[in-house]
Amino acid sequence: MDDGCLDMTKAFHVGCRGSVKSKDMLIEDTEQGWTTIDLDLFTDIGPVEAARRIKRQIGDTPTIVSVDMDVLEPGECPGVGFIEAGGMTSRELFRFLRALRGLDVIGGEVSDIKLAVVLDNFEMEAFPLTLNMSDK
């Protein structure tokens, strides 16, 4: 961001909720230029509308999608790094990702999983995210 490698007019945080470690975290996001669709707004407008808003703003810009698994309700994804109640369901996340199809996705990541906890179930958590984004 500081080097100008990321166009902050096309950078989103989706699904933020609950407590933060400090008020500075929210201020930093705003100062850096992130567009935030918090979980309350996401719930109100739904996953398809959230994706539509993002696609409208991103357009045909090459895109990287990063899914931080602690956006999910802890019961939906055991082994997340930051456990906090009130997250998305896996159904909502998958629907949101399917609605993002058509973006020029050139890379991505799935983060914040404690592999020691979920190693036996990794295919149940990370791999479906990729499939839901794919047009193939």
PLM segments and residue spans:
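Conserved alpha-helical scaffold segments that buttress catalytic/binding sites
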Residues: 1-136
